[in-house]
């Protein structure tokens, strides 16, 4: 009850409702035996629609520790994109370039610290080499999907959702 009007994320939102009633009712099982694989989407458009859909429910999570983390990630990516634009239009380039490089390095270090053990757990460590090259795309799609998730609409299961 209370999540019927949300188009997706019912599984995650249900787990949070259960946890709100009993903090010990939901546990995480880190085991290769229970990994559930989902087929990837087929196109870039579907990828963005999926990410926008995910972002649209960010403020619906009952776990109040999650939203500040999501907001922080969004703001860091937004700032990186803004700095890049300022550098491209030659606005105080030296200062903004230094700031961009420092923030970009910090973001990359934090994310790789998280990503390495995850990649090894899922036996995907051979894909880690592409991580630095995909950072610009990650910044861009995070800003677009986050903004569209909050203020835009998306297609899901054949219907437009706002």
Where are the predicted features?
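Membrane-interface alpha-helices
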Residues: 23, 151-162
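Membrane-embedded multi-pass helical conduit in multi-pass membrane proteins
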Residues: 66-69, 73-152
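Catalytic donor/gating beta->alpha subdomain of glycosyltransferases that bind UDP-sugars
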Residues: 2-66
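General alpha-helical segment detector with a strong preference for membrane-spanning helices
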Residues: 14-15, 61, 81, 111, ...
């Amino acid at each position: 009850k209370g999540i019927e009007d949300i188009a997706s994320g019912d599984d995650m939102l249900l787990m949070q409702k259960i946890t709100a009633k009993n903090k010990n009712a939901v546990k995480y099982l880190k085991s290769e035996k229970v990994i559930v694989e989902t087929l990837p989407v087929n196109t870039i458009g579907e990828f963005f629609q999926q990410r926008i859909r995910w972002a649209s429910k960010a403020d619906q999570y009952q776990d109040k520790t999650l939203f500040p983390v999501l907001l922080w990630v969004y703001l860091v990516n937004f700032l990186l994109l803004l700095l890049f634009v300022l550098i491209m239009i030659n606005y105080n380039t030296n200062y903004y370039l230094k700031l961009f490089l420092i923030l970009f390095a910090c973001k990359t270090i934090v994310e790789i610290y998280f990503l390495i053990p995850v990649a090894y757990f899922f036996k995907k460590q051979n894909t880690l080499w592409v991580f630095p090259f995909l950072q610009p795309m990650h910044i861009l799609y995070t800003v677009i999907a986050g903004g569209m998730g909050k203020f835009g609409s998306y297609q899901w299961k054949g219907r437009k959702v706002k």
